[in-house]
Amino acid sequence: MTSPLTPSASEGRWTPRLWGTLLVLCAAMFLDALDVSMVGVALPSIGADLGLSTSSLQWVVSGYILGYGGLLLLGGRAADLLGRRQVFLVALGVFALASLLGGLVDSGPLLIASRFIKGLSAAFTAPAGLSIITTTFPQGPLRNRALSIYTTCAATGFSMGLVLSGLLTEASWRLTMLLPAPIALVALIAGLKLLPRSARERDHNGYDIPGAVLGTASMLLLVFTVVQAPEAGWTSARTLLSFLAIAVLLTVFVMVERRSPGPLIRLGVLRSGTQIRAQLGAMTFFGSYVGFQFLVTLYMQSLLGWSALHTALAFLPAGALVALSSTSVGSIVDRFGTQRLLAAGFALMVVGYALFLGIDLDPAYAAAILPSMLLIGAACALVFPSLNIQATDGVDDREQGMVSGLLNTSVQVGGAIFLAVVTAVVTAGAPADPTPQAVLDSYRPGLIVVTGIAVAGLLIALSGLRRTTGAQQTVVVARSDTRSVVKETATGTEAETERVPVRD
């Protein structure tokens, strides 16, 4: 299902141009993750230099999350309608300019604005980049390998961001903001030459402006509410009214999408059990990991007294394992299918989190911490590529951006919601007498929640494993004059359908 405007990969082999295309897209994914992790370590220096309060400092992080999570649905559909290459390159250019702005500003509000713009840009590069891969590389071993390399760049970027931030902040926090700019510029120049040209969707049924406004508004409000809830209070009038407004917006959004001839999100996509499992798996995978990283970072820095760089190096084995496995995961998917890898990955994740429950105040890294890091790294290497493959397999080229945006939205919303839940649990159990042991004990309920989220992901994966029982599935894409309907079948037939075999 490749576009006639994409470079030919029908022979099932890698070419220098395909490698160049993938490298550009990986650079953008790497930058997104790098930017998220680098700023966390630099926050104390930023606050001291710009005179920001703790609440204002939070928005240096939350501003990026708000722009990214709130606009992913729009970014994915824009890639389908306006051209994937065009959307990706314009957004990458904006990302580079916002990085430059963030490193040069001398006020908190401008820094927060630059972070929001970077998040907004990433909301367009992420789904556009993923959809370029799924429409350039033919479905099967070639695409699976490309996706496994692409998705592991996120873990690599995140791990390197932690280490680089610890080093750069020693000189100036501004370097952490400026570093992505030259990388983005080089990727932009290379992308102009290497990325395949894609035509705009000519036969779409107009632009879904009401759906875009409602979908973006509901996602922005959801992310904002979840980020603010721990400070405002989960049962406060403001939080409850915000959730009520979100429910109303989403209800109206669904009504609009059902009637729109060219919807922002075609709701029929969500009738596929495989698609539902991919979206829920993305939420539980990222939500559990973000909560784990938050608690472990607090443990290492607040209770063990480790520096930011020491903490980053403690997480490095997990990222290194993901990076080293990047070229082999695709072939494992070809052999065993995504559902088996998801079940195995979530099982490893559950064990890794559970092992950390027994941690104490005097741990031996090799015996107490490293095993969890390696198990979680192996889990990430299996789960994240499999989720991307599962979500995009069998989807029409015209809807790859939409599905990519939906998957990335699930990742971000899951991370925001579950991190807020873990934070609320830990805050509720904060000890009156904050001795180190009492504080450590207050972290354990949060770790139990993290483990429970991973167990939920494992159950979702196992439900798909029972359905497939090792057989090959067929995703049926049925078309009508105005919209498509995607659904899952094992033996049924459909009139006017296109069948795509998927190893689920």
Predicted regions and their residues:
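A residue-level signal for alpha-helical anchor/packing sites in multi-pass solute transporters
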Residues: 132, 136, 194, 224, ...
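12-transmembrane solute porter fold
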Residues: 18-34, 39-41, 54, 175, ...
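Intrinsic disorder in cytosolic terminal tails and internal cytosolic loops
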Residues: 1-17, 464-504
